[in-house]
Structures are given as C-alpha cells and as structure tokens.
Amino acid sequence: MTEEHRLISAESVTEGHPDKVCDQISDAILDDLLAQDSSSHVAVETSAATGVFLVFGEVTSEGYCDVQSKVRETLRNIGYTSSEVGLDADSCGVVVAITEQSAEINQGVARLTGDQETAASREERYEAQGAGDQGVMFGYATDETPTLMPLPIYLAHRLAFHLTEVRKSGEVPHLRPDGKTQVTIEYDDDDKPVRLDTVLISTQHDPEVTQDWLAVELKKHVIDPVLDEVLGSKVPHDNYRQLVNPTGSFILGGPAADAGLTGRKIIVDTYGGAAHHGGGAFSGKDPSKVDRSAAYATRWVAKNIVAAGLAHKVEIQIAYAIGVADPVSVNVETFGTEQGVTRGQIAAAVRKVFDLRPAAIIDELDLKRPIYLKTAAYGHFGRTDVEFPWEKTDKVEELKAAIAAE
C-alpha cells in the first residue's frame, strides 16, 4: 500500500446482537401502534440484561400495544427460543414503564387537532407541525456502490445479513443469533476502493463447534458468496485477510453476555463512519421526531443528487428548532466532487425541489406506516432486501431542471 492510499473500515451486527435486539423491540412496538393509529406519537426505549428487558418511554396513541407479547414475539423471530442459546423468549422477564408524551412537547408538534387538521390546507398543516425536537441530522450518498452507499458499510451489512440467513435456513448448522462483521477496504488517492484488505466475522455458536470448521464453513457459505455478489470483478479480493472469531469460542452471546440498549448502534445504522452523525438514534421514534424523519429525508436528498450525476458524493446537514417547521439550516457538502455545477447551484436546487418541513417529509415519504421494524437491523440505508421510500430517486429530473433554470 502506498503512502497516498488508506484503509477504511466499517462494522455491522446481526439481529441477535443485544443492542439490535433492543432496537427491534422498540420498532416492533412502534409499528404495532402505527398500524392502529397512524398519528401515534411514540418514543420507546428498550434495555436488556441477562434474562430481563425494561421497556420505557412515552406514548400518545389511540392504539394499544401488548408490550410483553410484542417483546416475546420479537425475541422468538430473532431466534432466542431457549436458555441454551442464552435467552428464552417465553420465560424472560419484561418490565414496562411507559407514560404519556409531555403536553409541552406535544403543543409544539401538533398545533392542529381533530377537525382543525381535517379542514386545514396542506400548506397550513405543513406550517402547523413543528419539529419534535431541536437537533442536527446528516444524510450521505456516494457513487462507489450501486446502492449509493459507502462500500465498507454496505459489504459489512451484506455479510451480517447473509450470516443470519444461513443460520435461520440451517445451511450452516450450530450457529446462534449473536454476531458481528467488519470490513476493511483500501482506497487510492482518488478516494476509490481498490482492494479488500480484511473480513472479520464473530459469530455465536454451539459448544461442539471447532473454530477451524467454522472458518471453513463461513468462508464457503457466507464470505465467498457475498464477496462475489458485492465486489465481483470490480474490487480485487483474492488476497485478503480473513478473521473468524479471533478470540476463540463464542458460545455465550446476546443479552446473556452483554447488556443491550436501543440507539447504541447509530453508526451501524447509517454510513459506517463515512459521514457525520448528529447523535440522534432512530428506533422506537415515530416520524414526528426529526432525529428519524429528517435523517431519512437527508439521505433521500443526497441520493437524488448523486443519482442525478451532480456530484460523486455528497453530505447533507440539516438542523431544526423544536416547535418550528422550517429547518434552521440546510448545508450541502460535495467534497470537491461536483460535476459541471457549483456547490452553491446544488444547494439552491435542493431548496427549490425539496420541502424539508417535518410534515412535508412525512407526507412525501409516507412515513406514518408500520415500516420500521425492518429498518432495525442491517442498516436503514442502501438495502437490497427491502424497499424504503427514502431510497427512491424520484427527484433526479427536477434537480436537473432546477440547475438548468439558474
């Protein structure tokens, strides 16, 4: 590797990782409430320790969620079905401490209620709904993969997803739910990926498994198929370092081995460290929370900019004040990769094409639906196994037209 080249890494985790277990429980509860009342206001956190879960937060909804049942259903779907794997969904403890959302917060978010909202015009609704909190959010896109995601995090997610697939299908026996992946890619001085350097997989397994057997099976059934799918002939991967369970056995996993908490994998959830992060987590939050909806909207904006060929990569920063509809600021950073246009022209086109008020985002991306559980593992962006509305590139022509009209 030359001095101008650099190594960039990103990690992912499987759905059985204790933090991801908590994310999925929080989003399963959110989905259940949105399915009954699309205007539900939800902010639900989950924490996990050995044999016990605490679900807490604030909810205002016409719906009702049986939290105990939802926790156990989620755990069963992940694969925590017996004490042998470290957790039994049917016998673990579940403590619920959910209260109603603060009226002071609600008054800034929902100024129109009932008949007022029904009678209001779209513009009146968009102006009436302020941001659910202050904060800064980021969205990112790059043309180094077909999904317009950074290669390290995209590859790490694909490995984690396929690791779970072969566990659930039985293609590789003796695997248990907890697991992590990590990928290191070499980039050249033009910031292009040129070589796979390292693949790391740590996976929970049954006691009778040897590490040598596991390394062979994972290479055959997980690593090789994913590398062929994602890298193909585009990025050399014939001389990389493979690490499987580098500390040795990994029998005890999940919440039995480590405490879990909603919102503790925010870099895994987004861009693997390739972009900035405002710090706000996603899971358990309804779309009135701009931590979530604005992060989705900025990904949508960034992806359309790159898909339109205006820049090779772009990061969008947006900021809000609680109770105020219009963003405090919107910044476009193209890292010097803009193509035939200036950064200022792109920023002006974004302001013309995208309405980034919270209610407008919710309407445009149709976010008042039970779509969030599927986001809670393997990344919120750049997915190929499920379609999310913020991944659409429906504003490409409008952006080009806005640029041409300047």
Swiss-Prot record:
Catalyzes the formation of S-adenosylmethionine (AdoMet) from methionine and ATP. The overall synthetic reaction is composed of two sequential steps, AdoMet formation and the subsequent tripolyphosphate hydrolysis which occurs prior to release of AdoMet from the enzyme. This is S-adenosylmethionine synthase. It comes from the Bacteria. Its main location: cytoplasm. ATP binds at residues 17, 178-180, 258, 264-265, 281, 285. L-methionine binds at residues 58, 101, 258, 289. Homotetramer; dimer of dimers. K(+) binds at residue 45. It is an enzyme of class 2 (transferase). Its cofactor is Mg(2+); K(+). It catalyses: L-methionine + ATP + H2O = S-adenosyl-L-methionine + phosphate + diphosphate. Gene3D superfamilies: 3.30.300.10. GO terms for biological process: one-carbon metabolic process; S-adenosylmethionine biosynthetic process. It comes from Bifidobacterium longum (strain NCC 2705). Keywords: ATP-binding, Cytoplasm, Magnesium, Metal-binding, Nucleotide-binding, One-carbon metabolism, Potassium, Transferase. Its EC number is 2.5.1.6. Belongs to the AdoMet synthase family. GO terms for cellular component: cytoplasm. CDD domains: S-AdoMet_synt. It is found in: Cytoplasm. GO terms for molecular function: ATP binding; magnesium ion binding; methionine adenosyltransferase activity. Binds 2 divalent ions per subunit. Pfam families: S-AdoMet_synt_C, S-AdoMet_synt_M, S-AdoMet_synt_N. Pathway: Amino-acid biosynthesis; S-adenosyl-L-methionine biosynthesis; S-adenosyl-L-methionine from L-methionine: step 1/1. Mg(2+) binds at residue 19. Residues 101-111 are annotated as: Flexible loop.
